[in-house]
């Protein structure tokens, strides 16, 4: 029977059909090769937006710097970064006037955070630029390396101290005449493989000491490493993102803490909230504007787009904002917060890996590292690359480009939101002093603007005034990409509003699926995704039931765990059939062991092992939940785990799911090939940390330490703890006299070894 597809929509309001218009299934595009070109684009574009600024030279590093602040007032609609300090300060003052005490209170909250934050806060986060090795590392490793270098250079660095003390070390390190660092180097040699008798390249890694003079150290400390942003949909060209080193991170963290605290108190801010809370905020603003405009006024909404938001922002402007926000605060606090923007005004962008050349005829490939771009003959490059390199050359120092203006992607999201909101705040009638007024929402670079006025001319005048006010602080609304509708229809941060929010369920489609890493986690994540979408995205009961059945079907294929009584033949079916036949209570088998599906939409919140526990055969229970089962490298699991799910649009989201420790929750073993690479030394360090931490936590179960605290003190702490515990256990009769004596002997031996060392 042919179905006329339009019939499907007869009962559906038009706006609910948005899910059918989203093409985001399948894998998003990833970038390959080098990001050098994209980074040069960013640097060149940023300078172009500020080209009429003043050039100066940094006295410490010799880097040429462009300062567009208080530059020419705009005469056309071209995007520009010439923010006017007095305008920014005035916007801040008005923001404070309409929210009495907001800055004061946020400063007090932040001051408390500054005094309490420990340095291990910096171990959170993903890849970080490790300035000692000049490449990205996991955050914890990069921090450890930084602290190790600080300590060997006579600074008091301590992994368990306060973050503020670490930042004092950072400041001191910048005053030092030279810094000695430990870097890795590779030796390659050709050797004959005994097994295959072929020639292979063997790499060995050595560590060597290297001295950096003040200039070289400062350049490294101020460097942001760049990469290509992956998995961006809907774009033809890739773009560069930056990751700062450990010197900058701590300062940025405190500035963002202050800005976050301010954003939480602003009704127009789309950050730091997300999801349903964000929708409620937006709905409130829309409701307010519509209620006020019922009879006499017109109300229009602009779904806005800004041109290169962060390339037109300026760290010097952020410094002015912070100076104003903290003006009545103690000197030390103002200093701590002003360092991040100062470092950003002097930042350097690392150009990445450089270019790869290959000659098809000679089968040769060669890498031109970024350091060589300053001197290499340009005849080897195509025209567009040649232009880029010519333009960037005056800015190059040691393979990094001086980049004073602009903010790089994703650095001061909260603080730039405060700036955006301060312009929205100026739309109140008491400030516009005319018949039109505006309000709206700002979330980083995304905004929605609602303008009310008695007639169309008023609306136009309002939009125009908003546009020009934005220009004065370095915000450039893209006229071509912003569109205006009657209030009630708009889009903000990929939420579509039409008389209320339209659930765009297709955005979540990519996160439905089975990743094939771990049977226990996959089952739990799968049902949690369905549960969450029923709560948040209007996933109706019938569709959810269908999604669930499809999910179970999907789940059985990668793990080859079709029901024990199925006819489907797979590699596992022989074993699973045998298990099925010898199990008395077949309903108790997990799906991954060929059991039936226990789920329906009523019990999605219960982990599968819990649902089936009462139904299981006793010996199956014993095998399934046995931490001593030797065939599984067993993972201790907290009751809640975090999974990363990828919606179609926007950043990867972290999602909590229940984790029950069964023999089906395993950790994949590390890929062996890493052991032959330059990463091997780092891997060994990491494993060493891991072992120390695990040991330490056995002694101090409530331990909040995540990393060793200077070797001697840690060992001493564990030894003394062992002695105390042993004495208590001996006196209460839990251990025998011989065991007690043995423990004491071991403790003395450890101390003796420590002394000999």
From Swiss-Prot:
Modifications after synthesis and translation: Phosphorylated by host PRKCA.
Annotated segments matching region Promoter-binding site: 249-256
Molecular function per GO: identical protein binding; nucleotide binding; RNA binding; RNA-directed RNA polymerase activity
Compartments, as annotated in UniProt: Host nucleus; Host cytoplasm
Keyword Phosphoprotein: yes
Region: Disordered, residue numbers: 50-82
InterPro entries, A to Z: RNA-dir_pol_NSvirus, RNA_pol_PB1_influenza
Catalytic activity from the UniProt record: RNA(n) + a ribonucleoside 5'-triphosphate = RNA(n+1) + diphosphate
Family membership noted in the UniProt record: Belongs to the influenza viruses polymerase PB1 family.
Protein name: RNA-directed RNA polymerase catalytic subunit
UniProt organism field: Influenza A virus (strain A/Goose/Guangdong/1/1996 H5N1 genotype Gs/Gd)
């Amino acid at each position: 029977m042919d179905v006329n597809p339009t019939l499907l929509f007869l009962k559906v309001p038009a706006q609910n059909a948005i899910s059918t218009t989203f093409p985001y299934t399948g894998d998003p595009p990833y970038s390959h090769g080098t990001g050098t070109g994209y980074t040069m684009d960013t640097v060149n574009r940023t300078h172009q937006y500020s080209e009429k600024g003043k050039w100066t030279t940094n006295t410490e590093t010799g880097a040429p710097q462009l300062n567009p602040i208080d530059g020419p007032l705009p005469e056309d609609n071209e995007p520009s970064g010439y923010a006017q300090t007095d305008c920014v300060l005035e916007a801040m003052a008005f923001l404070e006037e309409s929210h009495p005490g907001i800055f004061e209170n946020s400063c007090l909250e932040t001051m408390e955070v500054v005094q309490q934050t420990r340095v291990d806060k910096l171990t959170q986060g993903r890849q970080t630029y490790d300035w000692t090795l000049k490449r990205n590392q996991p955050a914890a490793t990069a921090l450890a390396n930084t602290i190790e270098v600080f300590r060997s250079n006579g600074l008091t660095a301590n992994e368990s101290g306060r973050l503020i003390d670490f930042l004092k070390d950072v400041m001191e390190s910048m005053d030092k005449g030279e810094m000695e660092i430990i870097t890795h180097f590779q030796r390659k040699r050709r050797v004959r493989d005994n097994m295959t008798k072929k020639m292979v390249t063997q790499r060995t890694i050595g560590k060597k000491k290297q001295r950096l003079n003040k200039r070289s150290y400062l350049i490294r400390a101020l460097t942001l490493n760049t990469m290509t942003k992956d998995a961006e949909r809907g774009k033809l060209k890739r773009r560069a993102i930056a990751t700062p080193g450990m010197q900058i991170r701590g300062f940025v963290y405190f500035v963002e803490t202050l800005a976050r605290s301010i954003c939480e108190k602003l009704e127009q801010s789309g950050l730091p909230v997300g999801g349903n809370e964000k929708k409620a905020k937006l709905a409130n603003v829309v409701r307010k504007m519509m209620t006020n405009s019922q009879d006499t006024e017109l109300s229009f909404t602009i779904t806005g787009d800004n041109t290169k938001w962060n390339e037109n922002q300026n760290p010097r402007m952020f410094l002015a904002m912070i100076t104003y926000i903290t003006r009545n605060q103690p000197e030390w606090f103002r200093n701590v917060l002003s360092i991040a923007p100062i470092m950003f005004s002097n930042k350097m962008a690392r150009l990445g890996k450089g270019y790869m050349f290959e000659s098809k005829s000679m089968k040769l490939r060669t890498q031109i590292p970024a350091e060589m771009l300053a001197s290499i003959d340009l005849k080897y490059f195509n025209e567009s690359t040649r232009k880029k390199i010519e333009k960037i050359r005056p800015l190059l120092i040691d393979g990094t480009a001086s980049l004073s203006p602009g903010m790089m992607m994703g650095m001061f999201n909260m603080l730039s939101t405060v700036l955006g909101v301060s312009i929205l705040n100026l739309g109140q009638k008491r400030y516009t002093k005319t018949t039109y007024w505006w309000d709206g929402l700002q979330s980083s670079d995304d905004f929605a603007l609602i303008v009310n006025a008695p007639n169309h001319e008023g609306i136009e005048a309002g939009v125009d005034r908003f546009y020009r006010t934005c220009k004065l602080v370095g915000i450039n609304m893209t006229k071509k990409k912003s569109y205006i509708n009657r209030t009630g229809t708009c889009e903000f941060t990929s939420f579509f509003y039409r008389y209320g929010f339209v659930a765009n369920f297709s955005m979540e489609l990519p996160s439905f699926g089975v990743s094939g890493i771990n049977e226990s986690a996959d089952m739990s994540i799968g049902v949690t995704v369905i549960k969450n979408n029923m709560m948040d995205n209007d996933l109706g009961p019938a569709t959810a039931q269908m999604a669930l059945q499809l999910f179970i079907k999907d789940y059985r294929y990668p793990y080859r765990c079709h029901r024990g009584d199925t006819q489907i033949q797979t590699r596992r079916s022989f074993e699973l059939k045998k298990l099925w036949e010898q199990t008395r209570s077949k309903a108790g088998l997990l799906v991954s062991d060929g059991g039936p599906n226990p789920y329906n939409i009523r019990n999605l919140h219960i982990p599968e092992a819990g649902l089936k526990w009462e139904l299981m055969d006793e010996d199956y229970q014993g095998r399934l939940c046995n931490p001593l089962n030797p065939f599984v490298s067993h993972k201790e699991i907290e009751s809640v785990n975090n999974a990363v799910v990828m919606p179609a649009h926007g950043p990867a989201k972290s999602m909590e799911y229940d984790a029950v420790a069964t023999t089906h929750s395993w950790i994949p073993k590390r890929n062996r090939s890493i052991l032959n690479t330059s990463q091997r030394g780092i891997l060994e360090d990491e494993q060493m940390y891991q072992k120390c931490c695990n040991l330490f936590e056995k002694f101090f179960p409530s331990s909040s330490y995540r990393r060793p605290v200077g070797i001697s003190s840690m060992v001493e702490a564990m030894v003394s703890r062992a002695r105390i515990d042993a004495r208590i256990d001996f006196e209460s009769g839990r251990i025998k006299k011989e065991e007690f004596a043995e423990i004491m002997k071991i403790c003395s031996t450890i101390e003796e070894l420590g002394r000999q060392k």
